[in-house]
Amino acid sequence: MRLLVSGGGTGGHIYPALALIERLKQVEPDTEVLYVGTTRGLENKIVPDAGIELETMHMQGFKRSLSLENFKTIYLFLNSVHHAKKIISEFKPDVVLGTGGYVSGAVLYAAAKKHIPTVIHEQNSVVGVTNKFLSRYVDQIAIAFEAARSQFPADKVTMAGNPRAQQVAAKKDSDFSWTRYDLKDDVPTLMIFGGSQGAPKINKTVVDAIPEFNKRPYQVIFATGQKRYDDVKKQLAEGNIKPADNVKVVPYIKDMPAKMPRVAALVSRAGATTIAEVTALGVPTILIPSPYVTANHQVKNAQALVKNNAGLMITEDKLDARALLTQADKIMEDEEVRKEMAHAAEKMGRPDAADRLIKILHKAIDEHEK
């Protein structure tokens, strides 16, 4: 298969694509892939690091208010469609996959106009602007949340899940040991992670909660985000707060999927990739949705878990040390609650998500050949 993939800007658009590509190369080793992203997005580092060929285009998003910048955006979009058509003509893909972000809008639109098989993948429960626009032009639509189904043309939609789920499910039997962090393997572990950049409100809340976490019968590993580690260390020093042996504060946690099968529960944002990971692995989760995302989609993502008793939610406006400790204790101090939530999360998981998406890609190709 010759696959052209486009998605950019944030990790939520990129990592599912990389997980899909990894699986596709396992089952179809002769697969050739070209990734098309933006000149300024995270894909500029992540995609080449994964050994995948990358082409970039200059894009920018629409302002939500009337603005002269929007005329520039329209010009850039039309220019990018022209650029995308050239890339498509040169690469000659069998199918084009879009995973979100403005760049995928130009690429998938161009592919559809050239009558190339097209598929979009929507990771969130609330459909993004780009995928909403593309839904009328593409052949197939893969979703990760049932809530997204009604927002698309019904005859094009198939439930796939998030390919990242299959990638992390493969690490379920990880032999990782908490002794690497001077923690114990026979004590329930709560992992707290506000994202790769860290989240100031979450970090401050955890700092305030550490004196109580120090007294708990479970252990805590708290990743501050690389850029915010010094700030957290400063807050701890100013508050004269010293983490006990059962609490570890680290800048980041490398290879998170290898660690997650060994956690009793996770505190995190409610991004689509996180939801895919915790449901694939059956990890009880306390979700703190980011209030800084489009259409409040992280709240909707979190609600899907809460509704199925697979997670708890604290909105950021209600977040403080007491709220965090109350929810953490509810899970960490009751093994039966943990087991029930883990089972509920696993029931929601789609550990074959990449394989499902590969079938959808082939379906798009086959329908064009009829």
UniProtKB/Swiss-Prot annotation:
This is UDP-N-acetylglucosamine--N-acetylmuramyl-(pentapeptide) pyrophosphoryl-undecaprenol N-acetylglucosamine transferase. It is a peripheral membrane protein. HAMAP family: MurG. The gene is murG. One of its GO terms (molecular function) is undecaprenyldiphospho-muramoylpentapeptide beta-N-acetylglucosaminyltransferase activity. GO terms for biological process: carbohydrate metabolic process; cell division; cell wall organization; lipid glycosylation; peptidoglycan biosynthetic process; regulation of cell shape. It is found in: Cell membrane. UDP-N-acetyl-alpha-D-glucosamine binds at residues 10-12, 124, 196, 253, 298. Keywords: Cell cycle, Cell division, Cell membrane, Cell shape, Cell wall biogenesis/degradation, Glycosyltransferase, Membrane, Peptidoglycan synthesis, Transferase. Pfam families: Glyco_tran_28_C (PF04101), Glyco_transf_28 (PF03033).
